[in-house]
Amino acid sequence: LKTPIKTLLSLTVGLTASNIALASTYPITVTDVAGRQVTFDHQPQNIALSTSRIFPLLEIIYQKEAAKHLVAARDDMRVSAPSMYASYIKQYPSLKNVPTIGLIKSGEFDVERFINLKPKPDLFIVDLSNIKLAEDKGLLKKLNDAGIKVLTVDFRENPLKNTLKSVQVFADAVNRSKQGDAFAKYYTSHLNVIKETLAQHPNTPTPRVFIERAAGYSDSCCRTFANGNMGAYIPMLKAENIAIAPLDGSETGQMSPETVITSQPDVYIMQTTGWITNDGQPTSGIPLGYSPNHAAIKQATTDLMNRPWLQALTAYQQKNVYSIYMPFYNSPYNLVAIEYFAKWLHPSLFSTLQPEKTFEEMNLKFGHRHLSGQFGQDNFKAMNQ
């Protein structure tokens, strides 16, 4: 059967118009990860971020138009994830001109200046760690009175629970649910491979693991995570986090090298990157990330691995010391870190996992951009490359 072209065109236009009318029906109410109900009377266009390191959220939802929607953000990506910043600036040069805002937690956020920005934000995305303080300070009321909606997201405190909800609620709020659902489908399918593999091997040994938070950021050691942040991956991956007991219920805290030695982890993971200080000076972190400098990575890795107390650990002696790109700790792309952890904690079960390929694929699929880099490593191999 043949349908006349004119009829096909009429049907296509009719369907498209119908979809647009249906999708753009406002007001809509969404419930964010903080349990707040937020009602939107129109489709938000101008987005502000309380932390620029979650810019990938905009990329997932808006693809190549991500930068067009960003009208303000904190300047943390440039300092805390410089290779990420350089990569995005290359892709979206206009990001260099986005107005910067202060940190809510430190009291540097100027609400009056924010309200008067041009173009004016109509949606402010605030991370979960700052939302209660913003409410207590009266910032949420002032923003709401000015017509600026606030949506809470979380990729940091409880990533396994809140990552997909954060993406999907934002997608719903800006009338791009299809993009949110596509991301959720991809993320869930990859996560299920890990969960199902572990379920099929109930007798797999439970490795003891320690995560060194921000390795190389300062000379002191050892900040770490218990239940929150990347520490949340550990029980899901059928491993034991040695920080749980010493931190006694806290999400994050400090352990002495002596306590780490006493606990003797089987696997040691450094969460690190090539931070720069506010005045542009490099730190001693391992500069994993986009466009890696392998000589610099080798040197920084060697320096951190030469700490005498580290060499007293079982993990070191058995060559189970690894590094993960720290910005994954507050990113919707945290799936990549989970895959690295799975390989390192259970190498025999997950030898075929390819986390860097996953990251490249996610960026191409959701951000429509090609990238390469080094986002995780075996530290012993890095020292000998």
Regions found by a protein language model. Give the residues of each.
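N-terminal ligand-binding lobe of clamshell/alpha-beta domains
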Residues: 23-385
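Bacterial N-terminal signal peptides that target proteins for export
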Residues: 1-9
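N-terminal signal peptide c-region/cleavage motif recognized by signal peptidases
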Residues: 17-21
